[in-house]
Swiss-Prot record:
Signal peptide: none annotated. It comes from Aggregatibacter actinomycetemcomitans. This is Endoribonuclease YbeY. It comes from the Bacteria. The gene is ybeY. The keyword Nuclease applies. InterPro entries: MetalPrtase_cat_dom_sf_prd, YbeY, YbeY_CS. Binds 1 zinc ion. It is an enzyme of class 3 (hydrolase). The keyword Hydrolase applies. It is found in: Cytoplasm.
């Protein structure tokens, strides 16, 4: 099995209660399952102001969001092991965990897994795509020792 290299950037005013670099690496590795060599991605933990600005600029949505995924698009003739960037909003993740009555650490793990799958090209725009992605997320999360993240919706 290959190795995940995570460039963790903390751009949140409050760093307490955030997952560790080792946890984020474990969750991303479970989602990406690199086969050989090294695979790199950036995980940036931000506050609502930055999340809101990025969500507005790139998706036209006028509010912060839990996770944004920016896949690295490399020309075919160039081989670079870069997956892309995840931008995760601390306050949105904390609020959602509370609203959904989930352990905070489980929701952090889910956001890293969910975002990592987006970097691999998975999507949830169409119902069949959403079903496939949610099934894969559930499988990965349960493999990590967490409960089904969609349990409350079933």
């Amino acid at each position: 099995m290959g190795k995940m290299i995570i460039d963790l950037q903390i751009a949140s005013a409050d760093e307490s209660g955030l997952p560790t670099a080792a946890q984020i690496e474990q969750w991303a590795t479970a989602a990406v399952q690199p086969q050989s060599g090294e695979v790199e991605m950036t995980v940036r933990i931000v506050d609502e102001t930055e999340s809101h600005a990025l969500n507005f600029n790139y998706r036209g949505k006028d509010h912060p969001t839990n996770v944004l995924s920016f896949p690295f698009e490399c020309p075919d003739e160039v081989e670079l092991p870069l997956l892309g960037d995840l931008v995760i909003c601390r306050q949105v993740v904390e609020r959602e965990a509370q609203e959904q009555e989930k352990p905070l650490i489980a929701h952090w793990a889910h956001m890293v897994v969910h975002g990592s799958l987006h970097l691999l090209g998975y999507d949830h725009i169409e119902d069949d795509e959403a079903e496939e992605m949610e099934s894969l997320e559930t499988q990965i999360m349960m493999g990590l020792g967490f409960v089904d993240p969609y349990l409350s919706e079933k």
